[in-house]
């Protein structure tokens, strides 16, 4: 027992955490380390051949190096011919071929599905066969072998005689049309080409050639009936011939993929297009300033701008037309309803007494001369409105602080003078003399044939400035307006002895360029207020 304990103490490793890499087969006498965990060496399964101490023999390569021999090619040919003649035996060769043929005909390895063979008969309990029951009870069950069906494919070498007429056998099933194959119209079988050559009614152009292969069976047709297809071939009367369709034209219409449908008779020039431009200044002005007085609103300003687009066909080679002239009285929201009625009645009376404004108001939708691109209509302000005008002029000082926070001067101001005047850049001629009237001006731009009344936009809010931007298609006009500024015009305000408010409007010729239009004007006033338009 003491020897065993001493042996255990000797084989106990000093460091049990270390895994020694040892090959136990290299030292079979060292049995003391066999119980430890070891890793297999790469040379464990390596086989080594030790030379046997028997008879020594040189290899062929070594003999060729030691004793090289020169071989004559004629000798090689002679030996080969001798061996070939000596080995030919017809009886032996016939036996070999017979054995090979018998092996492949009787001992079947992979039988062909098309030939009968005399090999093994399959067992009755073949897994491919099933038992069918003739009765419900287990006693009435009788095994019956169903008919077997073999579906297989094999590679067969077909040998045909020289005088075999292949066309007579397969000619009815495979008939090629040379005209269709050689013509470029053979591509018409594609769905894209069919869609391109369909006219509006769905019929196919007669220029396309027609091919008449056999139609598929009815089972293949029914599977494609419910599918969406751009092909004009529909229903059971499907034919793959593009030239001879049996369906009706309504059933072969190709689906319209483009949202632009063809509408005959509806062209852009056949009817006048009418556009309505909504003005944000006119719609939001009443709620921002609290003006609820209907007398200060123009009949044409109800959220819409009077700018309308005229058809170029109506204006080509003919006279130009103007939009409606607008009459806007200046009244404050502090007036009562009676004063508003008096003001409106006074305006109507003043328009009747003036001999100049009456014929000008009849110019609505009347043709103008080609040489007069601008026409100004006017209406007077009588002395009954002098108190209103005085209040309007008194608000100029209070309006200065509001305008500084709302608008930005586009040009440099000019020093003030004793009398309020307007100074503009001389852009062109064509000014029409009109004086002492509050008038609306209508621009007629020849390039875009557009008529507009900018007074409708500028007279919505008499106590608040507004900005209007008008796009005429080719030229863009941006103008600013306040209580004394009307879009695209120049005016001046003054107070005379009779305390009447007079505003003179002079037309301004637009300097129309190919890219843009610029309008500038400066104002001299006795008050610190300044206005400009660009």
Curated annotation (Swiss-Prot):
The keyword Lipid biosynthesis does not apply. The keyword Amino-acid biosynthesis does not apply. Residues 206-223 have a biased composition (Low complexity). Residues 115-127 have a biased composition (Basic and acidic residues). Keywords: Cell cycle, Cell division, Methylation, Mitosis, Phosphoprotein. GO terms for molecular function: protein kinase binding. Phosphorylated by AURKA. The modification Phosphoserine is found at residues 183, 191, 250, 305, 311. Residues 114-146, 206-232 are annotated as: Disordered. GO terms for cellular component: cytoplasm; meiotic spindle; nucleus. Pfam families: BORA_N. The modification Omega-N-methylarginine is found at residue 316. InterPro entries: Aurora_borealis_protein. GO terms for biological process: cell division; regulation of mitotic nuclear division; regulation of mitotic spindle organization; regulation of protein localization. Interacts with AURKA. Required for the activation of AURKA at the onset of mitosis. Belongs to the BORA family. PANTHER family: PROTEIN AURORA BOREALIS. This is Protein aurora borealis. The lineage of its organism: Eukaryota, Metazoa, Chordata, Craniata, Vertebrata. The gene is Bora.
């Amino acid at each position: 027992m003491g020897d065993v304990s001493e042996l255990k103490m000797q084989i106990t490793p000093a460091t049990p955490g270390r895994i020694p890499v040892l090959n136990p087969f290299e030292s079979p006498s060292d049995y003391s380390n066999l119980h430890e965990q070891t890793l297999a060496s790469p040379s464990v399964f390596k086989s080594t051949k030790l030379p046997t101490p028997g008879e020594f023999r040189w290899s062929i390569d070594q003999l060729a190096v030691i004793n090289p021999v020169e071989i004559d090619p004629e000798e090689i040919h002679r030996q080969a011919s001798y061996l070939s003649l000596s080995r030919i035996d017809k009886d032996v060769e016939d036996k070999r071929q017979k054995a090979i043929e018998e092996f492949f005909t009787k001992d079947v390895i992979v039988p062909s599905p098309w030939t009968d063979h005399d090999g093994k008969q399959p067992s009755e309990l073949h897994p491919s066969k099933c038992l069918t029951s003739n009765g419900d009870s287990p006693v009435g069950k009788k095994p019956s072998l169903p008919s077997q069906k073999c579906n297989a494919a094999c590679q067969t070498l077909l040998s045909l005689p020289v005088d075999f007429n292949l066309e007579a056998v397969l000619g009815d099933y495979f008939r090629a049309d040379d005209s269709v194959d050689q013509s470029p119209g053979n591509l018409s079988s594609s769905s894209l080409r069919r869609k391109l050559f369909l006219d509006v009614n769905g019929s196919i152009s007669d220029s396309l050639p027609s091919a008449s292969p056999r139609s598929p069976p009815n089972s293949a047709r029914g599977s494609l009936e419910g599918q969406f297809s751009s092909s004009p071939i529909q229903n059971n009367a499907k034919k793959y011939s593009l030239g001879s369709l049996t369906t009706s034209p309504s059933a072969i219409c190709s689906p319209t993929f483009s949202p632009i449908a063809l509408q005959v008779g509806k062209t852009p020039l056949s009817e006048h297009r009418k556009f309505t431009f909504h003005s944000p200044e006119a719609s939001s002005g009443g709620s921002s300033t609290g003006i609820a007085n209907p007398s200060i609103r123009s009949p044409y300003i109800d959220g819409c701008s009077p700018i309308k687009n005229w058809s170029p066909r109506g204006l080509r080679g003919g006279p130009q037309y103007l939009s409606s002239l607008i009459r806007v009285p200046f009244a404050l929201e502090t007036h009562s309803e009676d004063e508003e009625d008096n003001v409106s009645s006074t305006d109507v009376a003043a328009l009747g007494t003036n001999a100049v404004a009456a014929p000008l108001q009849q110019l609505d939708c009347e043709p103008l001369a080609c040489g007069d691109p601008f026409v100004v209509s006017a209406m007077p302000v009588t002395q009954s409105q002098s108190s209103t005008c005085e209040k309007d002029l008194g608000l100029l000082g209070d309006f200065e602080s509001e305008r500084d926070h709302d608008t930005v001067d586009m040009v440099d101001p000019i020093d003030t003078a004793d009398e309020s005047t307007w100074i503009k850049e001389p852009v062109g001629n064509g000014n029409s003399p009109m004086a002492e009237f509050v008038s609306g001006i209508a621009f007629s731009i020849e390039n875009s044939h557009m008529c507009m009344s900018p007074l409708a936009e500028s007279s919505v809010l008499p106590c608040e400035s507004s900005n209007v931007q008008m796009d005429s298609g080719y030229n863009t006009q941006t103008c600013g307006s306040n209580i004394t500024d009307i879009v695209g015009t120049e005016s001046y305000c003054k107070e005379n002895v009779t305390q009447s408010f007079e505003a003179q409007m002079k037309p301004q010729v637009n300097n129309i360029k190919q890219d843009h239009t610029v309008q500038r004007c400066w104002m001299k006033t006795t008050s610190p207020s300044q206005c400009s338009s660009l």
